[in-house]
Amino acid sequence: VRGSGYKMINMGELFSNDRIYNIDMELVPLTDKEKENAKVEKEDLLFARQSLVASGAGKCSIVMETDDMTVFESHLIRVRLDSSIANPMFYYYYFKSPFSPMKAIVQHSVQAGIKASDLEKLIVAVPSIEIQTKVVEVLSLIDNMIEKNIQINKNLLQQLHVLYLR
């Protein structure tokens, strides 16, 4: 019965959150095997298998934190990188960039989509871990400033509503 059990990241969360934190999610019951196979961990990359629009197929998000047992639904592909050679944040940014090779594996039909087997074969740039970390530092600073500006704008709008819509 949905509504009880474990948190599940679905397509809605993926398309609403580039960086997925410990947010409210749908709860689903799971067997032990399902929990083992679908568990997400911090720094897992999640990709959309399909989308109604080609630009959404292969969309990448990253799990930033999970407090509870959290799993992903079958419309997503989870990638867990070896952090000794690959900075997950670097590849999150890489797959969001114009340099992403994702377009090469998107298949077009009624719904655009990607297959896990094609994602496994995708050839990607592999700069040194030091360069990956430097790139992540810069891009994370920019992302954090954008998030702060969005929050400031929301707060300003709330203040306007309080002042002018009494």
Predicted regions and their residues:
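Amphipathic alpha-helical segments with low aromatic content
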Residues: 121-166
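Basic, amphipathic alpha-helical recognition segments used for DNA target recognition
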Residues: 1, 15-22, 54, 65-133
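Solvent-exposed alpha-helices and their adjacent loops that cap or buttress functional pockets
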Residues: 2, 38, 115-116, 140, ...
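Sequence-specific dsDNA recognition surfaces
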Residues: 1, 7, 12-45
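Short beta-strand-centered aromatic/proline hotspots
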Residues: 59-63
